[in-house]
A protein has these predicted regions:
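Short loop-to-alpha-helix "cap/lid" segments that border enzyme active sites
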Residues: 154-157
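Class I S-adenosyl-L-methionine
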Residues: 25-29, 70, 74, 108-111, ...
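Substrate-recognition element of Asp-dependent hydrolases with the DxDx(T/V) motif
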Residues: 84-87, 92-96, 103-134, 142-152
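N-terminal helical cap/lid subdomain that shapes the substrate entry/recognition surface
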Residues: 2-9, 13-101
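Short coil/turn segments at beta-strand junctions that form active-site/ligand-binding loops
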Residues: 1-3, 114-115
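Conserved H-loop
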Residues: 79, 137-141
């Protein structure tokens, strides 16, 4: 009989894509950029490249976080501070806790039958904010966030 369940946070319990889109739109607007579809698509291409570089060990997490906004702002010809843009985005994302349909109820039900553990490869401060605002900590015995562990998931280490 199973006693433990490991669950992933993003796109299993919380809708990361919705949270990302809303946080990015708020951030871009704050910095005077219209969050048009082509701008969001450009960000996603830049963001994907940066995360791939992290997975290959070519960039650090901090370089990804700031570098993606530096590249986006450069591509758009916007003279704004990429560090401030990153902070704004992470602040906006940290409160983005949009449950996938039925996920909140499923986690509550599973927590009555199993010891639950959570894994996430997100940024620690952002994920902690999302978990707190969604009131999810109460369901999990332990939360594993890759940044806190020093490994990206899935890592063999």
């Amino acid at each position: 009989m199973m006693e433990f369940l490991f669950l992933d946070l993003d796109d299993t319990i919380l809708d990361f894509h919705k949270a990302e889109r809303i946080a990015l739109s708020k951030t871009l607007t704050e910095f005077g950029v219209e969050p048009a579809e082509e701008v969001l698509a450009l960000y996603h291409r830049i963001n994907l490249w940066h995360w791939e570089q992290l997975e290959q060990g070519k960039l650090t997490r901090e370089e990804v976080q700031v570098g993606r906004f530096a590249a986006l702002l450069r591509e758009l010809g916007v003279s704004a501070d990429a560090v401030r843009c990153t902070r704004s985005y992470e602040k906006n994302l940290a409160v983005g806790h949009y449950f996938l349909p039925g996920a909140e109820e499923a986690v509550a039900s599973l927590s009555q039958k199993y010891r639950l553990f959570l894994a996430s490869n997100g940024t620690a401060s952002v994920q902690a904010g999302r978990l707190t605002s969604a009131n999810l900590y109460r369901f999990f015995e332990t939360v594993f966030i890759s940044q806190e562990l020093g490994f990206n998931k899935p890592a063999k280490e």
